[in-house]
Amino acid sequence: MFINTMSPSKLKTYNECKKKYQFKYVDYLRGIYNVNSNTDALQYGSYVHKIFELGTELETLEELENLAGDLRPNYKFSSIKEKNLSLILENFFEFNKKLEETISNEMIFKIDVTDDYSINGIIDRVIKGKSGNYLVIDYKTSRRPTPKTELFTDPQMLMYAYAVAKQFKVPIDKVTVAHYYPHLDKLVSVCYGRAQVSVFLRGLKNKIWEIRKKRKTDLKASQNQWCNWCQYKDLCPEF
């Protein structure tokens, strides 16, 4: 099976369920095939991300609140999701003031790892400090923060760290990656070493070759905790 690029979402999908990977990245099905699907969390997360993307240069909380109001009609989710919105905006506004130079919002990257594969994705925000260090921020609206121990092995953040190090030509230990939880005003951050990233990239190459060796008929469904939220559930042979 042909594959020459890997993204965090592609890797996550493959690890969760091979059949879901087939539907999304082999058959390219983009619709929602789940009559019970609830997209509130996805829509709300996209809404908050868009506020943060467009609001980094705003100088007052009122401007940020007005931006949120202007964007709201573009997203469909239950009004109950908005109960913490004022707190989220206040926390982000104060957090944002403390940050140094924003190099990029929604940074699209594609970085060659070897001659035959690359990694690609979109990073919420990249900050450059006066010392020349970089901070990669991934905004999160999930209820509970990811423990730092899990962040140390998070494939998404490892890819982001490698991409920023390559893009801006700095050592990997000059890049800090972090989840920011605006409802908690909590930043969970880690910094990776060269050896750790090298081990991860070797594992990623092995995963790519695993996928390359598979035929479409090898991609089987896996019943797990994500099934009820899967956009392809009604197509799945397990249901």
Placement of each model-derived feature along the sequence:
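A non-catalytic, helix-rich entry segment at domain boundaries
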Residues: Q43-I108, D112
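Surface-exposed helix-capping loop/turn segments at secondary-structure junctions
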Residues: E57-E63, K166-D173, I211-S222
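A residue-level signal for conserved active-site and pocket-lining positions in enzyme catalytic cores
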Residues: C17, V48-H49, R125, Y160, ...
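Accessory terminal regions of nucleic-acid processing enzymes
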Residues: S131, K205-F239
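Short amphipathic alpha-helical segments and their helix-coil junctions
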Residues: M1-I3, K20-N34, L67-R72, V136-S142, ...
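Nuclease catalytic cores
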Residues: N4, P8-T60, L85-S86, S104-M107
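Mg2+/Mn2+-dependent nuclease catalytic core
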Residues: M107-N206
